[in-house]
Regions:
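C-terminal catalytic domain of photolyase/cryptochrome flavoproteins
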Residues: 8-197
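Long hydrophobic alpha-helical segments that form multi-pass transmembrane helix bundles
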Residues: 1-7
Length: 197
C-alpha cells in the first residue's frame, strides 16, 4: 500500500504522524532481517518510477540508516560515548520522577505524551515524534541522552543499535552530522505544525 499510495508523496507526508501512509512501517522488518536495505532501495525505485521527490526522500532515509551502521562500525563506542567528547562534561540532571513521567507519557506536553504512550503500547513511534520526544528529554528535562537511548532500546520493536545511538546523539547535538546543540524542538509548536489534531 505504501509503494502505491504513500511513496509518491513521502517528501510531503513523512513528518505528519497522523497520516497512516506517511511512513512505510518497514523499520521492524529491516531490523529483524525480514527485508534488506538493498531490497527496500530497489523496490522503492521500481514501484514508483515517476514519483521523483517522494522516492528520493524515502531512499535518503534508507541511506541515513546505512550511514548510522557505517558510523557504528567506525566508532564502536557510539552507544556509550558521544562523538563530540565535550558533551561528556555536561552536567545532566538525575531526576527519576521527570524521567518516569517522560517514559509513561505523563509530561503534560501532548505530542510528547502521545508518542511515549504509543511507544509503550505498540513498540513503535513515528520518526518526527521520536525527535520531539528525544529533544524534550535532553533539552527541556536536561536528562542524559543515554537514558533515553536505553529506554528506546528496551521498548522499540525496531530498536537498531546503530540508528538508535546515532539518532540520540543527533538530537542531543553530540554526534556526527548532528543538529546544533542549541537547536531545541519546541514540542508545542511541533505538535501544532505536524499533528494539529
Amino acid at each position: 500500500a505504501f509503494a502505491r499510495c504513500g511513496l509518491a508523496r513521502y517528501h510531503e507526508q513523512r513528518n505528519l504522524p497522523g497520516l497512516g501512509e506517511g511512513t512505510s512501517m518497514l523499520s521492524p522488518h529491516l531490523h529483524w532481517g525480514e527485508i534488506s536495505p538493498a531490497q527496500v532501495w530497489h523496490a522503492s525505485g521500481h514501484a514508483a518510477e515517476n514519483t521523483g521527490r517522494g522516492v528520493e526522500a524515502f531512499q535518503n532515509e534508507v541511506l541515513w540508516r546505512e550511514f548510522a551502521a557505517y558510523t557504528l562500525w567506525h566508532a564502536p563506542h557510539l552507544p556509550e560515548r558521544p562523538l563530540r567528547e565535550a558533551f561528556d562534561r555536561l552536567p545532566w540532571r538525575r531526576d527519576a520522577s521527570a524521567q518516569r513521567a517522560w517514559q509513561r507519557g505523563q509530561t503534560g506536553i501532548p505530542m510528547v505524551d502521545a508518542g511515549m504512550r504509543q511507544l509503550w503500547r505498540l513498540g513503535w513511534m513515528h520518526n518526527r515524534v521520536r525527535m520531539i520526544a528525544g529533544s524534550f528529554l535532553v533539552k527541556h528535562l536536561l536528562i542524559n541522552w543515554r537514558d533515553g537511548e536505553a529506554w528506546f532500546w528496551d521498548t522499540l520493536v525496531d530498536a537498531d543499535l546503530a540508528s538508535n545511538s546515532a539518532s540520540w546523539q543527533w538530537v542531543t547535538g553530540c554526534g556526527i552530522d548532528s543538529q546544533p546543540f542549541f537547536r531545541v524542538f519546541n514540542p508545542v509548536l511541533q505538535g501544532r505544525k505536524f499533528d494539529p489534531d
